[in-house]
From Swiss-Prot:
<dbReference type="Pfam" id="PF05166">
    <property type="entry name" value="YcgL"/>
</dbReference>
<dbReference type="InterPro" id="IPR027354">
    <property type="entry name" value="YcgL_dom"/>
</dbReference>
<feature type="domain" description="YcgL">
    <location>
        <begin position="1"/>
        <end position="85"/>
    </location>
</feature>
<dbReference type="InterPro" id="IPR038068">
    <property type="entry name" value="YcgL-like_sf"/>
</dbReference>
<protein>
    <recommendedName>
        <fullName>YcgL domain-containing protein Shew_2183</fullName>
    </recommendedName>
</protein>
Length: 93
């Protein structure tokens, strides 16, 4: 299975995986509006890979088969202040 991976120009670090290059027919219109004009990053042979950097490859394959697309969003930012407060045991109580 080869899929096309596109990055968003509007949403940093957001990627859209689709079954075929330039085929966005199964991607919902509201998602396409939010994503903006897709920019092709690569064609990716999923059957030759065991893992992906930030996504579960099996989930990607299932969603491509069922929905025709997979949306990869960036992980939420780490709140370093909150992490530090936990580390030192700070509590407002």
């Amino acid at each position: 299975m080869i899929c096309a991976v596109y990055k968003s120009r509007l949403k940093p670090d957001s990627y859209l995986f689709v079954e075929k290059r330039n085929d966005f027919e199964r991607v919902p219109e509201p998602l396409m509006k939010m994503f903006g004009t897709p920019e092709l990053v690569m064609l990716l042979p999923l059957n030759k890979r065991e893992q992906l950097a930030l996504a579960d490859i099996e989930k990607v394959k299932v969603e491509l088969a069922e929905k025709g697309y997979y949306l990869q969003l960036p992980p939420p930012p780490v709140n370093l202040l909150e992490e530090y407060k936990k580390e030192i045991g700070y509590s407002r109580d």
